[in-house]
Amino acid sequence: MEREKEQFRKLFIGGLSFETTEESLRNFYEQWGQLTDCVVMRDPASKRSRGFGFVTFSCMNEVDAAMSARPHTIDGRVVEPKRAVAREESAKPGAHVTVKKLFVGGIKEDTEEHHLREYFEEYGKIESTEIITDKQSGKKRGFGFVTFNDHDPVDKIVLQKYHTINGHNAEVRKALSKQEMQDVQNTRNNRGGNFGFGDSRGGGNFGSGPGGNFRGGSDGYGGGRGYGDGYNGYGGGQGGTYLDEKQNLYSSGNFGGGPSYGAGGGRGGYGGGPSYGNQGGGYGGGYDNYGGGNYGGGGNYNDFGNYNQQSSSYGPMKSGGNFGGNRSMGGPYGGGNYGPGNGSGASGGGGYGGRNRY
């Protein structure tokens, strides 16, 4: 039997005691299954624990079992496990933010809220579902939201990028509020350099390559050209905001296009291509008022795969940058030495998310 891809079997463990070793980490998580890998990340010079690590199980069911048994206490300390983000996804702003709300794109006219609930309830307890409609025409705008009572269902769902709902392909993303997107941008601004992934040709861009700036303004986080490395026009377009049913403000920009939908033309909409096209190739109007910014190309910031202990930054990266910074990424995995390093453009002192120090 072929083993599931590693990205579905790996957990990031934040908040580790500096006394926790790979042996104690392994002993704790082996109660839910067989581990194929276990590592505590350490400073390459001092060999001191950096306060986080990874465990990889033999199958995803074991990961589910472990996450269902939270909270986890190791060596007298409550740790914060989270499904690891794959390399190709970790380069995108907001990939590490912890949210309970899921964005669902590709919703067709014949798809109702009960279809969303029926499909996603197998992942966790759902608090609400919403399909966005045009206030004037009443027609569906092609996207919606599902809110869970926990972040783990969202993390699990986005690992599998495409889903089939009511017979139609749908794309899922974490739904980031405008404040969460602002936190992401503030992290970049306060870090003072390249975001720590890509090949830095864009000069401090979230996405590498010319014109791939993640820039904000009064109209949200749109603008600029998306870096077309497999995600032509992902982001870009004009900015704006969106209020959901609870009057929560969500940030802007067209949702962008992915390779399975064609080459996102015109306004950088979700898709492009004649079969989806309107407004210059944007899918359903390009998902105006949601998305946000240029998510850029693939990048090389890696919190998932290769544990390069010789690198001072969190995983190997071609830019030499660093994912840390003085501001929070909005997630629960904070401070200490999650992100600091000697990479170019890195200010250090920051964290993978959340609190400044444990």
From Swiss-Prot:
Pfam families (UniProt xref): HnRNPA1_LC (PF11627), RRM_1 (PF00076)
CDD domains attached to this UniProt entry: RRM1_hnRNPA2B1 (cd12762), RRM2_hnRNPA2B1 (cd12581)
Location in the cell: Nucleus
Composition bias type Gly residues, residue spans: 193-217
Keywords (A to Z) from UniProt: Nucleus, Repeat, Ribonucleoprotein, RNA-binding
Location of region: Disordered: 182-217, 333-358
Claim: Manganese is one of the keywords in the record: no
Name of the protein: Heterogeneous nuclear ribonucleoprotein A2 homolog 2
Species whose genome carries this gene: Xenopus laevis
